[in-house]
């Protein structure tokens, strides 16, 4: 059943107008101009939607009714650590949150345990299912990767809780340090595209380009840098790309890293396609990336967690992924959709 969301349209239109009017805001990063930083804002190297595109999308918006709540079957408690360097274990938490364990290191991507993805509980996207790992069962986290600062990927309340239990290193794009000032936490490092950080004698993380955007309000559009992460560990390269559209930058990633043991790719929030294709990949795009990067395995994320004014059904990603896998002749067991809380292991 389709539902026209009038209140969403009005609020979104007002927000967009204010974004255009108030072009100056807090500066989260000050540095020299580059191919992706100009006039105090970060930019994509490929076309974005225009203001008129946004208005057209808002005018045409039709949301699809989702279930108010989905109960998932309980999964085993995650391991405290995976000590072996020839084993990689990944556990899907929810949305873009993935627990990555190998060589005695626990890495967590874009963690969110909050009930709502937004500035306040009554103005954001509501959760429709519980995280796959209960917070009190989360192992000690060594590194947190933040792909960008949208509310569904950078959740301050969750970060505060993890800092209180684990004191992890937080890695993100340029501007993330100032963005997290409210935490009063000093173990944060910001990276430019292609900048590297070595976290162990055998482990290295590289911040890589993506095609997306950033911002949390009316005055900070694209003031911080978005991107993905390549985790280089003995078992092989792992790509966590966060939120992204399909783009030419994947060719650059392929040239630099050649091959991947695992790619973690978004496969949700992709309709209406004419508008979302410059922000979010769909399952067809994700399978193409799987093939382009010579990935041994891939894993889909960013689906069916928050009701974000979705314009596709709650299970559309599963159906469309099956179609794409058949289209590109990729075996279904090479591209996973894990249950919330489900873990898988890869060995060298």
Describe the predicted segments one by one.
Residues 157-162, 183-184, 249-253:
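A short acidic, amphipathic alpha-helical/loop segment
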Residues 100, 110, 148, 155, ...:
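Divalent metal-coordination and catalytic microenvironments
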Residues 27-32, 36-40, 45, 135, ...:
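Cap/insert and terminal regions of metallo-dependent hydrolase folds
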